[in-house]
């Protein structure tokens, strides 16, 4: 006769526990399957945690930071570079316009300067 066991609740591990288990799996002489068995975790789950650890998403979750997909990060970095390029261009335009205004003011001042006695007559 087959004994049917009741549904077991899955154990939820904290981020610190996951990091400790992952770090243990990277130790010399330790294998993923061995560490997984020691902690009652499926090897596939441990491989997933290792991948997340290497991508930095496990530590981001531990620090309470928001995890952003790599594609969104790449798009944001591209947008930042484009905005920095535009800012540099606008800064150069602004400097040129400042110089033009100063040059125009200097010419205007010379054109409207009163003639002093003995200058032209």
From Swiss-Prot:
InterPro entries: Homeodomain-like_sf (IPR009057), Transposase_8 (IPR002514), WH-like_DNA-bd_sf (IPR036388)
Domain of life according to the entry: Bacteria
GO biological process, one term: DNA transposition
Keyword DNA-binding appears in the UniProt entry: yes
GO molecular-function terms, A-Z: DNA binding; transposase activity
Keywords linked to the UniProt accession: DNA recombination, DNA-binding, Transposable element, Transposition
Function summary: Involved in the transposition of the insertion sequence IS2.
Family in the record: Belongs to the transposase 8 family.
Protein name per UniProt: Transposase InsC for insertion element IS2-8
Organism: Escherichia coli (strain K12)
Lineage summary: Bacteria, Pseudomonadati, Pseudomonadota, Gammaproteobacteria, Enterobacterales
């Amino acid at each position: 006769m087959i004994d049917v066991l009741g549904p077991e609740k899955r154990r939820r591990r904290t981020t610190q526990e996951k990091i400790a288990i992952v770090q243990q799996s990277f130790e010399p002489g330790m294998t993923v399957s061995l560490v997984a068995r020691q902690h009652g975790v499926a090897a596939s789950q441990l491989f997933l945690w290792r991948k997340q650890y290497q991508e930095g998403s496990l530590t981001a979750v531990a620090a309470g930071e928001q995890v952003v997909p790599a594609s969104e990060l790449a798009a944001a970095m591209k947008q930042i570079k484009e905005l920095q390029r535009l800012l540099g261009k606008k800064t150069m335009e602004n400097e040129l316009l400042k110089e033009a205004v100063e040059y125009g003011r200097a010419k205007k001042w010379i054109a409207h300067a009163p003639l002093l006695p003995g200058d032209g007559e």
